[in-house]
């Protein structure tokens, strides 16, 4: 897919990124009841994301075409201290966010953003990249599997009845 560039985030992208994060949050609210209204939380969420990116060898990358915002991907290097896991599992790349505008979904842009995140993470020395997805988000799961991601851990949830 031609006609777009992927470049580092600039502060002038903030409004478009927050709007994208709100759109993503509102979509995820249709998939699971744990998601709060996007407009209420995404400004603070993005502030925290920027801090994590700065502290953890990360990047926020923007896809655009002629100045039109098309999407974003954010990634960090995450370090865990799980004594039962290998070193390359404990220090891994993590894609925190990915978003593509609705009229470009299915065009290959998500794949290009994922590659760009991998290109950013590779020089850090990580050999694994992870991404989380809501179980009900079949479209995202297909995109990640198409890109070569495989299920790693599966988390189950059960609601408990209120007890007195």
Map each language-model feature to its residues.
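Conserved N-terminal entry element of GNAT/NAT acetyltransferase domains
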Residues: 1-15, 164
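A short helix-loop-beta-strand connector motif used in the catalytic cores of GNAT acetyltransferases and
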Residues: 46-61, 94
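Conserved acetyl-CoA pyrophosphate-binding loop and the N-cap/start of the following alpha-helix
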Residues: 104, 108-116
